[in-house]
Amino acid sequence: MAQFDNVSVKKKANVYFDGKCVSHTVLFPNGTRATVGVIFPGALTFNTGSPELMEINSGACKVRLSGESDWKAYGAGEKFTVPGNSSFDIEVTETLDYVCHFE
């Protein structure tokens, strides 16, 4: 999907890790939400409250889910899921343009 139609977008940016991750929240008519943003190159750890589906629009990264030892590489057009009440490590090697869907 190239765009979201009939949504609301929160104007205030979500800024994390001293500006290394910046996103905006998108609210859908059915009550679900997502964030649309960028993560700049570097290594970060994110904690999750609810399950997440991460779609990579462009860029490159490696991800290691909590409790796993292996890293998996992701690039444009790929996605990965993260369980709720968990965390994941991400190493961004090329600025990441992403959509994170909260389930």
Swiss-Prot record:
Sorted keywords for this record are: Glycosyltransferase, Transferase
GO MF annotations for this entry? guanosine phosphorylase activity; purine-nucleoside phosphorylase activity; thymidine phosphorylase activity; uridine phosphorylase activity
Organism superkingdom = Bacteria
- Which residue stretches, if any, does this entry annotate as coiled coil? none
Gene Ontology, cellular component aspect: cytosol
Q: Does the keyword Glycosyltransferase apply?
A: yes
Q: Which reaction does it catalyse?
A: a purine D-ribonucleoside + phosphate = a purine nucleobase + alpha-D-ribose 1-phosphate; adenosine + phosphate = alpha-D-ribose 1-phosphate + adenine; cytidine + phosphate = cytosine + alpha-D-ribose 1-phosphate; guanosine + phosphate = alpha-D-ribose 1-phosphate + guanine
**CDD domains from the xrefs?**
cupin_PpnP-like (cd20296)
Instruction: Tell me if Calcium is a UniProt keyword of this record.
Output: no
Write down the EC number: 2.4.2.1, 2.4.2.2
Can you tell me which family this protein belongs to? Answer: Belongs to the nucleoside phosphorylase PpnP family.
Role summary: Catalyzes the phosphorolysis of diverse nucleosides, yielding D-ribose 1-phosphate and the respective free bases. Can use uridine, adenosine, guanosine, cytidine, thymidine, inosine and xanthosine as substrates. Also catalyzes the reverse reactions.
Record's PANTHER family? Answer: PYRIMIDINE/PURINE NUCLEOSIDE PHOSPHORYLASE, PYRIMIDINE_PURINE NUCLEOSIDE PHOSPHORYLASE
Q: What's the protein here called?
A: Pyrimidine/purine nucleoside phosphorylase
